[in-house]
Amino acid sequence: DVVTPGSYTLSAFSTLFNALYTAGGINDMGTLREINVFRGGKSVAKIDVYDYIINGNNDGNIRLQDNDLIVVGPYDAIVSVGGKVKRPMRYEMKDDETLSKLLTFAGNFTGDAFTKNVRVIRKSGREYSVHTVEKDAFASFKLFDGDSIYVDSIIPRFSNMVEVKGAVFHPGMYETGGNINTVLDLIDAADGLR
């Protein structure tokens, strides 16, 4: 599943990635997760491009020899993740990978993400279903082809804030509790009335 399959003449120093580039790259149906190189009918290398991109592991990018065969099969599952993650996009997942692995691919949560749970939208027969996955189940929740994951943001409100506006010297937000327990304390914190 490459853009332009076929036989190619490459330099003696060419690697698996050079050959994939020459063939136009992997097409929309091809896998990035398990690319095999066969030599004399036996598998001599297997590469997961995600392992290379995310971890820098270049072990499977071997130098090719005459008559090597590169096999790029179809992907197992494509899922999308959006909302409050650092790299929201579509990712290819292997059969045994879970929501936790997807979040790692997506760079994990942003600073303003609601991390207690996430929503998974899944095709169920003729309609969609929504699954709320709690944080302690991330490592065991399996993903399937076509799943969409959404991470919400925290609620845009404060648990300990009061705001003063108007005829005070320093209007703005102030922490409640501690030194500010009454309206008079708040006016004092704002340096008094004008």
Task: Map each language-model feature to its residues.
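Ser/Thr/Pro/Gly-biased, low-complexity, turn-/loop-rich segments
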Residues: 1-194
